[in-house]
Amino acid sequence: MKFDILTIFPNIFQSYFNESILKRAQKNGLIKIASHNLRNFTADKHHKVDDSPYGGGPGMVIKIEPIFKAVQHLKVKSHKALPAGRQVKTRVILFSTRGKKLDSKVAKRLSKYDQLILICGRYEGVDERVAQYIADEEISIGDYVLSGGELPAMILVEAVSRYLPGVLGKYESLEDIKGSYPVYTKPEIFKPRTPPRARLARGGKNPAKGEAHQRRQALRTWKVPKILLSGNHKKINEWRKIHGCL
């Protein structure tokens, strides 16, 4: 799987993609991730990628020309890299607040492609003709506005990569998604101990309040649910289904 990201901030991805699961997947040749500077696909000497919108309005808009050139370049490059006769399954995605919500079903569907070209907007968005004629679909990560599509691109790359064979390690599970149900670890019983607020506030000791604080502390214990300590995996799985969020 090849991820090609079109952006005006290509260096923003390096730290995230060079850690953990994605770093290992790239090292093992399971995925390739490349960020491409849209300014390299401009024709003017200033490498201008934006302009003011027709009809007026605040801000600037990413132009269609560099995006079109970049997408065509990446498609041709991928086609040439394959043996003669084989077609590259490519999907061009534009990140947009009005797009389809990214969820596990969308990620799994996208994992069937050979190449995903991800278009990251900036400023006030991109020329609408990108959505109309270049992108195959628009995707959103939620009902809120971000400065650009770079963060959604990072999220999509990891979400899709997890569905590719070999990407997840021995102790990582796709079906039992971490965080889909409550998880606990040692100690079985945790007794939090914090300094008395009176002492912190006044910079000294207050015997009466100190004793009350100690009594309250003695009553505070945070325990692991007994069912998880039972060793009964059938009941544990039932508990997880009841308390799960997926």
Predicted feature residues:
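N-terminal nucleotide/polyanion-binding subdomain common to many enzyme families
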Residues: 1-74, 218, 229, 235-236, ...
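Hydrophobic/aromatic beta-strand patches that form the interior of the parallel beta-sheet core
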Residues: 4-6, 34-36, 91-93, 116-117, ...
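A short acidic, often aromatic-flanked loop/helix-cap motif at beta-alpha or helix-coil junctions
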Residues: 39-44, 100, 145-147
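S-adenosyl-L-methionine/SAH cofactor-binding core of RNA-modifying enzymes
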Residues: 62-79, 88-122, 128, 165
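Short Gly/Ser/Thr- and charged-rich N-terminal loops/segments
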Residues: 78, 82-89, 193-220
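Structured adenosyl-cofactor binding patch, chiefly the S-adenosyl-L-methionine
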Residues: 126, 130-173
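Internal, active-site/partner-interface "lid" segment
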Residues: 151, 163-193, 220
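Compositional signal for N-terminal targeting/processing segments
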Residues: 187, 191, 197-200, 226-230
